[in-house]
């Protein structure tokens, strides 16, 4: 899962949106650096990452990637799951329009920004102002996201080419998303993530 899904599942679980968004910027034990609600959000994010990577649907989808891109398949799939969530938001969350949800999430996260890591603050400058979460529905934007990650981290250069794997298996990936994401939503609502 990427930013949108983590925020959505955190909302469904009545968990810290800030902690769920911050988690990728925190290493080790967060308890000595952050408030308890943010720490719980960080741990929820980590549990979701492990769970998603181990889903039968995700394991199957990784096999569809070519040899040269399989190493980055988990990252590429995380971004792609957000694409499907954004694309189908009106079906998934009919009572909370995506634009309203993004405004709500931004307000939640903005309260903690001044005290958090500079890289996280920098991400937030772009995430909200450039409307990334809404733009995830556009496959051209997904390609830009993958290219941007490859530019920032040269060892992940294969992300550029992973776009072709997404394109080749788009319909099958979308089907897999519909297999697992409603289950994860139900787990979040039961606070079982």
UniProtKB/Swiss-Prot annotation:
GO molecular function list: [acyl-carrier-protein] phosphodiesterase activity
Pfam family, one: ACP_PD
Superkingdom, natural source: Bacteria
Role description: Converts holo-ACP to apo-ACP by hydrolytic cleavage of the phosphopantetheine prosthetic group from ACP.
PANTHER family: ACYL CARRIER PROTEIN PHOSPHODIESTERASE
Similarity remark: Belongs to the AcpH family.
Protein name (Swiss-Prot/TrEMBL): Acyl carrier protein phosphodiesterase
Organism: Salmonella paratyphi A (strain AKU_12601)
Gene: acpH
């Amino acid at each position: 899962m990427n930013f949108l899904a983590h925020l959505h599942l955190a909302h469904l679980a009545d968990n810290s949106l800030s902690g769920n968004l911050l988690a990728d910027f925190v290493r080790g034990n967060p308890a000595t650096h952050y408030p308890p609600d943010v720490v719980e959000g960080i741990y929820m994010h980590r549990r979701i990452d492990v769970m998603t990577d181990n889903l039968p649907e995700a394991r199957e989808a990784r096999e569809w990637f070519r040899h040269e891109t399989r190493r980055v398949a988990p990252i590429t799939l995380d971004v792609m799951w957000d694409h499907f969530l954004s694309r189908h938001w009106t079906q998934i969350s009919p009572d909370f329009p995506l634009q309203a949800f993004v405004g709500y999430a931004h307000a939640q996260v903005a309260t903690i920004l001044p005290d958090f890591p500079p890289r996280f603050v920098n991400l937030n400058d772009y995430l909200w102002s450039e409307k990334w979460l809404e733009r995830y529905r556009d496959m051209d934007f997904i390609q830009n996201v993958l290219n941007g990650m490859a530019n920032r981290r040269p060892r992940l250069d294969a992300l550029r080419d992973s776009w072709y794997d997404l394109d080749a298996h788009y319909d099958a990936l979308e089907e897999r998303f519909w297999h697992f994401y409603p289950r994860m939503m139900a787990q979040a609502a039961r606070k079982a993530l």
